[in-house]
């Protein structure tokens, strides 16, 4: 139990209710304690998280601690990741993911090697947006974890860190991992590349059995920004899923790949308005006056968002005419 001392009369007034036999009373008292926003009240919150008999009280304590980054709080939340009740584990994981300081990240870091996969994945998730350089090594090791959620979170860390040394391992996961979400995440993380080294892996992802991976591959090829990807993206305009076609069209616009003009013009007649809109915007990005005829025909499209995109594209091409 944490040493608990306070002179705050508002906290002292809550103590009998914090020790009440009724879990509902204790939970409401914790909420009122947290509303005081007094650091002196933290020991009662961390103790409730650690030892209260009622899962609903422990879960509430985990939620209420999300705004605090004191070491005792971070340690208590990390320990709660292994709680026997799922609501407590989930609440602790969410609160940890809200932390912003590198100091908190360093306290979380040892938990990425915990025996429990949920703990490992949650610790990695909490570290992701902190951009803690010390997390790169453990994340690289976690790419080989036997549990897909752990691998997925490790990919996220390496992507946020823009850790280029991880590119070969990420390319392998993008092509070969058994889990669709891991392949999708790894494919997206390849966007940190600055050369064509990752193109073979992205081309493979563009032919993945899962459309979500193909969609991510098309997006990432646009981010990498290499014109060599143009032909593969043009082929992706024929994908069975319109979501993949949309991302391919957007990527072709980003690449200003003029060889896609005919295929993008055809998409202006597609039955899905979002795809017509993206095709119009991409044609504007190409900067080729040859697209003007198709765009002018699309000015009467039945969807206002498509018409707006057509107007934008026509304005872009005025100087190219």
Where are these regions (language model features)?
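Amphipathic alpha-helical scaffolding segments comprising HEAT/armadillo-like alpha-solenoid repeats
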Residues: 6-17, 38-50, 70-82, 101-113, ...
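Alpha-helical segment of the N-proximal tetratricopeptide repeat
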Residues: 13-37
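Short inter-helical turns and helix N-cap capping residues of alpha-solenoid HEAT/ARM repeat scaffolds
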Residues: 21-22, 53-54, 84-85, 115-116, ...
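Core register positions within helices of long alpha-helical scaffolds
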Residues: 32, 64, 95-98, 126-129, ...
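Ankyrin-repeat and related helical/solenoid repeat scaffolds used for protein-protein interactions
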Residues: 238-312
């Amino acid at each position: 139990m944490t040493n608990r001392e306070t002179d705050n009369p508002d906290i002292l007034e809550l103590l009998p209710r914090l020790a009440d036999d009724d879990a509902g009373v204790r939970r409401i008292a914790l909420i009122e304690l947290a509303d005081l926003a007094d650091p002196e009240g933290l020991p009662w919150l961390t103790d409730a998280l650690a030892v209260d008999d009622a899962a609903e009280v422990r879960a509430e304590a985990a939620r209420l601690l999300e705004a605090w980054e004191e070491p005792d709080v971070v340690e208590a939340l990390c320990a709660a990741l292994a709680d026997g009740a799922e609501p407590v584990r989930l609440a602790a994981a969410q609160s940890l993911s809200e932390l912003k300081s590198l100091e908190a990240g360093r306290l979380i870091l040892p938990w990425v090697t915990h025996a429990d996969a949920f703990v490992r994945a949650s610790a990695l998730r909490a570290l992701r947006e902190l951009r803690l350089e010390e997390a790169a090594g453990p994340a690289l090791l976690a790419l080989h974890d036997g549990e897909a959620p752990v691998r997925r979170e490790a990919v996220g860390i390496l992507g946020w860190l823009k850790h280029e040394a991880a590119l070969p391992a990420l390319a392998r996961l993008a092509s070969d991992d058994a889990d669709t979400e891991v392949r999708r995440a790894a494919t997206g993380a390849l966007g940190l590349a600055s050369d064509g080294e990752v193109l073979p892996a992205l081309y493979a992802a563009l032919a993945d059995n899962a459309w979500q991976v193909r969609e991510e591959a098309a997006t990432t090829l646009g981010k990498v920004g290499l014109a060599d990807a143009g032909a593969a993206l043009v082929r992706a305009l024929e994908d069975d899923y319109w979501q993949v076609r949309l991302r391919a069209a957007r990527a072709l616009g980003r690449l200003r790949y003029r060889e896609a003009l005919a295929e993008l013009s055809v998409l202006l007649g597609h039955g899905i308005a979002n795809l017509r809109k993206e095709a119009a915007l991409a044609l504007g990005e190409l900067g080729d006056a040859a697209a003007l005829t198709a765009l002018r025909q699309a000015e009467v499209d039945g969807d206002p968002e498509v018409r707006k995109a057509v107007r934008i594209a026509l304005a872009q091409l005025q100087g190219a005419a």
